[in-house]
């Protein structure tokens, strides 16, 4: 498995696969072939939702404002639903310089090879192998990360700072998010919206939800966030960590350890399945983020490896089949609210795990396998194409 630096990327929203990934491809082209007149041809989900996700905007920012963008949404066989081709004009002709796939979380494959093509850091390939190693060596998941990648904790400090800042920025802001939905920011309102007869549990859930709203709204507004594991699901892990840090006085060192534990879970999914909504639906984004947040909270509570696995498994299992159907191709409805719901789900998964970990029958690795199979079976209308689900019904009489 790769470095946690390849999982947690600090960048701009609204979409890791549709903005951060294509931006990487564009920088590769400029660094390799130089500046000039480029044409970008987008296929699959990039063509269908690229406009709403800002793919054309980031490509023009890197390649030049005169870059021609072609959205080819025709159905065709693709190696990955997020495929793009870049052409450079040479002697009056368009010459193909690269074919790339944005495979999720801002990671890209260019001309058949991962870019950058970094070596594996962690030799284990699944959670069972990770568990075997840490139990044989009496380690925790954060210890496991320290064993193979000790220097990454300096990077995780930057990741945590970026997460924390995105929560705090989002809580301060009012106004309307960009795009035709004209969606109002709700994080600040939610944070202060104490209701009559509100129970202590409801109050804590509301605060937790407001933190997730804050980050997800920053993401939708092209703000700086962290892929965890993606931009579309970027509010879930920061919400849980910020809640423990600010409202429960968990020290920063434990937050960084929790980030490491969550990163291992995210890496296992990335290695064995997908974190791309265009490939496997929202279960691969929000579902995996929920699982990562549950693992992080389990680490803070010092649960053993069985407890961590049980928490992560519960969180992912109950997001199986979750569709990706962004309205108008924007990372707003249902994405923002879904981040908040998943943050609460992550806490509930840990609550269940504390009591049920010794009685479970399903492994995390098997849930990951099922998630991938489910995603592959899912109709393309529900895989980030905005042609099915909520995206296809928005604006009907029922929504008026």
Label every model-predicted segment.
Residues 297-400:
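Functionally critical mobile loop/hinge segments
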Residues 65-197, 207:
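C-terminal regulatory domains involved in ligand/effector binding and gene-expression control
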Residues 9-11, 276-281, 326-335:
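Short beta-alpha connecting loops at secondary-structure transitions
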Residues 1-9, 23-46, 52-53, 63, ...:
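Non-transmembrane, aqueous-exposed alpha-helical and coiled segments at domain scale
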Residues 164-249, 253-267, 274-277, 281, ...:
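Accessory "access/gating" subregions that flank catalytic or transport cores
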Residues 8-28, 221-240, 282-290:
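Conserved phosphate/anionic-ligand binding catalytic regions in large, soluble enzymes, centered on
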Residues 210, 214, 235-245, 260-268, ...:
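Contiguous, well-ordered alpha-helical segments that form the cores/surfaces of helical PPI scaffolds
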Residues 19-31, 238-249, 294-302:
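Alpha-helical support elements that line or immediately flank enzyme active sites
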